[in-house]
UniProtKB/Swiss-Prot annotation:
Pathway: Cofactor biosynthesis; (R)-pantothenate biosynthesis; (R)-pantoate from 3-methyl-2-oxobutanoate: step 1/2. It comes from the Bacteria. It holds the Pfam family Pantoate_transf. The keyword Cytoplasm applies. Gene3D superfamilies: Phosphoenolpyruvate-binding domains. Catalyzes the reversible reaction in which hydroxymethyl group from 5,10-methylenetetrahydrofolate is transferred onto alpha-ketoisovalerate to form ketopantoate. This is 3-methyl-2-oxobutanoate hydroxymethyltransferase. Binds 1 Mg(2+) ion per subunit. It catalyses: 3-methyl-2-oxobutanoate + (6R)-5,10-methylene-5,6,7,8-tetrahydrofolate + H2O = 2-dehydropantoate + (6S)-5,6,7,8-tetrahydrofolate. The active site is at 195 (proton acceptor). GO terms for biological process: pantothenate biosynthetic process. Mg(2+) binds at residues 53, 96, 128.
Amino acid sequence: MNKNSQQKAAHVTTRRLYDMKQNGEKISVLTAYDYTMARILDRAGIDVILVGDSASNVFSGHNTTLPITVDELIYHAKGVVRGVQAETSRAMVVVDMPFMSYQLSPEDALRNAGKIMKEHECDAVKMEGGRTIADTVRRITDAGIPVMGHLGLMPQSIYKYGSYKVRAEDPAEAEELLEDAVTLERSGAFAVVLEKIPAGLAAEISRLLSIPTIGIGAGAECDGQVLVVNDILGLNREFHPRFVRQYADLNTVIEQAVRQYVEDVRSGGFPSVDESY
């Protein structure tokens, strides 16, 4: 057990996120899909870890987020929760509700949200949509399950939109999105992700809502920011969207390490006497 794991920090809750917004403290969010990465993120002080349906892309290699299932996300979430618990236990863990796990009916959504919460003790679930899911958000929150909303570009609706372009540039769509944000708050959502919308609109929504806004490609005036951890670490050399800041080039580092390992094995340089029993 490391030193950090012996010094448990105050766990981030929905109330803590609300207080951070009121105090002008920015909220940091990253995705994670496994135990090891979750330990690193929690140790580094991340506020929220999102077990995103983006695992469908970056972990499983699918072109969209649609194929991933509830059970697959639960598998990822179990490792993430254990990783956080092994370190400071500070980070909140939010799990995406995957495509078609909440669209059929509020009752079906509640059943799936309850399964996600019960099987690995995460803190909340996240759902895409505005007024169309208002009754579902209300049903789930009334059952005691915190819900994070998601507006703007909604990857689960990619075939409806036809592209990953910026959303709500049209004034009419911007007004609808603003109304969706207000509806989510009134329905009980504790926060809302704003993805790929104009920075000015995101700033307006952030001022209007009392709950935190978490931006991804939505400007600096959101109450927090979320990115995919693989992107900030430079693990995907083909993916460089404008809204991502790359903090490392681990793709190159890992490739070089593997090449050196292969060379050492082939040359007989590994293992050495010191690495043998």
